[in-house]
Amino acid sequence: ALLLRRQGYEVIGVTLELWEKNDLSGVRDSCEKLNIPFLCREGHELFRQQVVDPFVKAYRSGLTPSPCCICNRRVKWILLQQVADELGVEYIATGHYVRIAEREGRFYIRKGIDPQKDQSYFLWGLPQALLRRALTPLGEYTKKQVKEWAARNGYEQMARRRESMGIC
């Protein structure tokens, strides 16, 4: 959000509650510190229908599902698009370590700069309509650079936050 603010974008913080209730105080504090609005969108039922139930069914059938890819395509980006459309917002930004490239009117997902943290696989199923609106500023940096930059800019708590490692 801070990177985008410095690039001149008007930013709104959006958190999706998909599985369990989380302590959102850190997110709220960050939005307050940045002086940007904060919204929380509930998506428990959609998440259960589109991710959890198919995951369990596939796993019981002996398959190895990829719930993060499904969640991004069928839940997270759908909800973010709904929020953006409701607010009349043109772009949807996330903290994924990927880059979006455009060539001849078609958008492509590219690996992020950091080979250790590239997340392009997780967004492979996004349609062109969403890729066209996507901003992924962290894809141009390594995770280490982002954490150092956050700490230097007064976001030490964010810089020290434990990484997400998979299923939610």
Question: Which role fits each region the language model picked out?
Answer:
Residues 1-125, 135, 143-146:
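ATP-dependent adenylation/nucleotidyltransferase module used to activate substrates
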